[in-house]
Amino acid sequence: ADLKVARAALHMWEEPCISGEAGSGAVFFSGCSVGCVFCQNHAIAAGQSGKRISIERLADIFLELQAKGANNINLVTPEHYAPSIALALDMAKAKGLHLPIICNCSGYSSLTALRILSDHVNVWLPDFKYYSPELSRKYSHAPDYFTVACQALQFMYEQAGDPVFDDSGIIQKGIIVRHLTLPGCMEDSRSVIHYLHETYGDKIYISIMNQFTPVSELLSDYPELNHTISA
């Protein structure tokens, strides 16, 4: 089985405890489990960009990123390739891969895929996009987003436990939940953050992202999203 990869490189713009100074070894897989109307990586998420590679080549890419000094291997939207990625990680580890593995995903993840990856993943980096089913239906075609994301996050927490950092402040295991604030959706953001805090307290980290950038050609039907976040 082959996989479609859009990009593999040192990535300097993740959270500081992921990228550090050396960078995160990010592998961007084509395709995504959720269809957000505002996606800033639309061509990748829709599976339109990328190159077909073998499992063996993916294993080599992991090792090449390690050789370049990456702090970790960062699997971006990996769930739909979970069995193949697990095989590639087995191959790479047999050849000396020893970095923490990050699962960087939408939060709208099947437990089946997460279970396949869980033997390898040290750090879970899920999105938690919505509390409201109305918003998740309207903007991501996923009315059950909150329910699915809650189940996925609970599974991740059972696997990862409390966060651990090395002496350089780079996360080695644990969970960082990302939440992207959307224009006009501040109450929903408050509900998401309240839920996460009430459920997990200080057992997880929350990364609140305010860099929403409208992609105008995708948002002609959603004018309320076609501007940046105001202070």
Predicted feature residues:
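Auxiliary Fe-S-binding modules of radical SAM enzymes
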Residues: 1, 161-231
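Conserved radical SAM core fold
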Residues: 45, 82, 107-110, 128-146, ...
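Conserved Radical SAM active-site core
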Residues: 2-124, 132-134
